[in-house]
Amino acid sequence: MAAPAKRARVSDASPLAAPCPVPRAAARVPLPLPAGPSGHEPESDAVAGFLRWCTRVGLELSPKVLVSRQGTVAGYGMVARESVQPGELLFAVPRSALLSPHTCSISDLLERERGALQSLSGWVPLLLALLHELQAPASPWSPYFALWPELGRLEHPMFWPEEERLRLLKGTGVPEAVEKDLVNIRSEYYSIVLPFMEAHSDLFSPTVRSLELYRQLVALVMAYSFQEPLEEEEDEKEPNSPLMVPAADILNHIANHNANLEYSAEYLRMVATQPILKGHEIFNTYGQMANWQLIHMYGFAEPYPNNTDDTADIQMVAVREAALQGTEDETERLLLCERWDFLCKQELVGEEGAFVIGREEVLTEEELATTLKVLCMPAEEFRDYKERAGWGEEETEDGSLAITNIPKLQESWKRLLRDSVLLTLQTYATDLKTEQDLLSNKEVYAKLSWREQQALQVRYGQKMILHRLLELTS
């Protein structure tokens, strides 16, 4: 289930604009308990029903764990009844209990129509399986659906009013990612999903033929589903399709997690990775996720400074703009554009790409180092470099773009990097001091809405990384 540690070098940051990324487990926010999209069920009844269902399907829960809303960071979670040691099994989910296109009641149909259901996201078969099972009164997964959050109250930014999304998340990269998601979801629904449901109207009631419900289920799959990793010898294959893993998606996330999902032929097992004290919550990981990714895909952010995987982006075009600002005449501008075009042809930069800066390192080190080098090198050196297309060129020394080594960079590199950071900071609606004032005043912070608090954590974490870069390049 772990996410890739680094983003693609040239990425549009949208999980639905390309083949399906690694989905993770669920983001948890305090929401009323539903029984799927059609009704409500008291919490104790829902948990009891789910536990009875676990027994029926052979999902084995350790007696040391408890499914509960009490003692969790948000919503449902899993808590240790007794102390747990590393390596202990927390629960085991038989593959027959997984909800996927291969296990649902219309699996044969989905397999026959597989060619017609292909999409950029790769999620359509699972989403159709969910749409069918949700409407079925006797669905084998009904007790599992009872633990889902209320679909109409998901907190992903795609459900925020556009004005609120822009106001709270401007500069973070989230509004742009959401807009791409919404365009792709709408296209996928009307071109593939709705025609399929209408062609099989006996299997899909009018109540589930809804773009809004489809959008909600996309958010659910984005947040709750898992994707089994390929074996090393299968690296050239297409990624595995996402699937729903009951019990595993109950666990909440923190960067310093204490459990991990393991895959085997018959079972998926959640195993403790570090000691868990009695009464403490059991946490899985969604991978190395920056706060902007967490809020985009799951609807929450980790409070500063807890997310050690947090990052800030410097748009590649911002570096180009900063370099252009340093030119003095048209000749210099044309020469700089020539260098940029060279970098584009080398696939090191792109119009929608970003340089990703972590707390301790530059995650896109090769791309940023080469870009700074090419844009700052003397004209004659660039001509030689271009003729060789970079072949045989000595690479930047290992670790030269570790955050602590940035002061050692050439002055021209530091100046360009600093100017790029300043341009990036201008894209936010507020400055760092405004965020610090909100965070330091507990009374004021407590009065903020959930969305305002989460967005503040995203903005603040990014700005702290960017301001540290300013200090190191001064």
Swiss-Prot record:
<dbReference type="GO" id="GO:0051059">
    <property type="term" value="F:NF-kappaB binding"/>
</dbReference>
<feature type="binding site">
    <location>
        <begin position="252"/>
        <end position="253"/>
    </location>
    <ligand>
        <name>S-adenosyl-L-methionine</name>
    </ligand>
</feature>
<keyword id="KW-0949">S-adenosyl-L-methionine</keyword>
<feature type="modified residue" description="N6-methylated lysine; by autocatalysis">
    <location>
        <position position="64"/>
    </location>
</feature>
<feature type="modified residue" description="N6-methylated lysine; by autocatalysis">
    <location>
        <position position="373"/>
    </location>
</feature>
<dbReference type="GO" id="GO:0016279">
    <property type="term" value="F:protein-lysine N-methyltransferase activity"/>
</dbReference>
<feature type="modified residue" description="Phosphoserine">
    <location>
        <position position="14"/>
    </location>
</feature>
<dbReference type="GO" id="GO:0048863">
    <property type="term" value="P:stem cell differentiation"/>
</dbReference>
<dbReference type="GO" id="GO:0032088">
    <property type="term" value="P:negative regulation of NF-kappaB transcription factor activity"/>
</dbReference>
<feature type="binding site">
    <location>
        <position position="225"/>
    </location>
    <ligand>
        <name>substrate</name>
    </ligand>
</feature>
<dbReference type="InterPro" id="IPR044430">
    <property type="entry name" value="SETD6_SET"/>
</dbReference>
<dbReference type="GO" id="GO:1904047">
    <property type="term" value="F:S-adenosyl-L-methionine binding"/>
</dbReference>
<comment type="subunit">
    <text>Monomer, homodimer and homotrimer; these structures are stabilized in the presence of S-adenosyl-L-methionine (SAM).</text>
</comment>
<dbReference type="InterPro" id="IPR050600">
    <property type="entry name" value="SETD3_SETD6_MTase"/>
</dbReference>
<keyword id="KW-0539">Nucleus</keyword>
<dbReference type="Pfam" id="PF09273">
    <property type="entry name" value="Rubis-subs-bind"/>
</dbReference>
<dbReference type="GO" id="GO:0018026">
    <property type="term" value="P:peptidyl-lysine monomethylation"/>
</dbReference>
<keyword id="KW-0597">Phosphoprotein</keyword>
<protein>
    <recommendedName>
        <fullName>N-lysine methyltransferase SETD6</fullName>
        <ecNumber>2.1.1.-</ecNumber>
    </recommendedName>
</protein>
<feature type="binding site">
    <location>
        <begin position="74"/>
        <end position="76"/>
    </location>
    <ligand>
        <name>S-adenosyl-L-methionine</name>
    </ligand>
</feature>
<comment type="function">
    <text>Protein-lysine N-methyltransferase. Monomethylates 'Lys-310' of the RELA subunit of NF-kappa-B complex, leading to down-regulation of NF-kappa-B transcription factor activity. Monomethylates 'Lys-8' of H2AZ (H2AZK8me1). Required for the maintenance of embryonic stem cell self-renewal. Methylates PAK4.</text>
</comment>
<feature type="binding site">
    <location>
        <position position="298"/>
    </location>
    <ligand>
        <name>S-adenosyl-L-methionine</name>
    </ligand>
</feature>
<keyword id="KW-0808">Transferase</keyword>
<dbReference type="Pfam" id="PF00856">
    <property type="entry name" value="SET"/>
</dbReference>
<keyword id="KW-0488">Methylation</keyword>
<dbReference type="InterPro" id="IPR011383">
    <property type="entry name" value="N-lys_methylase_SETD6"/>
</dbReference>
<dbReference type="InterPro" id="IPR015353">
    <property type="entry name" value="Rubisco_LSMT_subst-bd"/>
</dbReference>
<feature type="binding site">
    <location>
        <position position="224"/>
    </location>
    <ligand>
        <name>S-adenosyl-L-methionine</name>
    </ligand>
</feature>
<dbReference type="GO" id="GO:0019827">
    <property type="term" value="P:stem cell population maintenance"/>
</dbReference>
<feature type="binding site">
    <location>
        <position position="123"/>
    </location>
    <ligand>
        <name>substrate</name>
    </ligand>
</feature>
<dbReference type="InterPro" id="IPR046341">
    <property type="entry name" value="SET_dom_sf"/>
</dbReference>
<feature type="domain" description="SET">
    <location>
        <begin position="63"/>
        <end position="287"/>
    </location>
</feature>
<comment type="similarity">
    <text>Belongs to the class V-like SAM-binding methyltransferase superfamily. Histone-lysine methyltransferase family. SETD6 subfamily.</text>
</comment>
<dbReference type="GO" id="GO:0005634">
    <property type="term" value="C:nucleus"/>
</dbReference>
<dbReference type="InterPro" id="IPR036464">
    <property type="entry name" value="Rubisco_LSMT_subst-bd_sf"/>
</dbReference>
<feature type="binding site">
    <location>
        <position position="227"/>
    </location>
    <ligand>
        <name>substrate</name>
    </ligand>
</feature>
<dbReference type="InterPro" id="IPR001214">
    <property type="entry name" value="SET_dom"/>
</dbReference>
<feature type="modified residue" description="N6-methylated lysine; by autocatalysis">
    <location>
        <position position="180"/>
    </location>
</feature>
<dbReference type="GO" id="GO:0050727">
    <property type="term" value="P:regulation of inflammatory response"/>
</dbReference>
<keyword id="KW-0489">Methyltransferase</keyword>
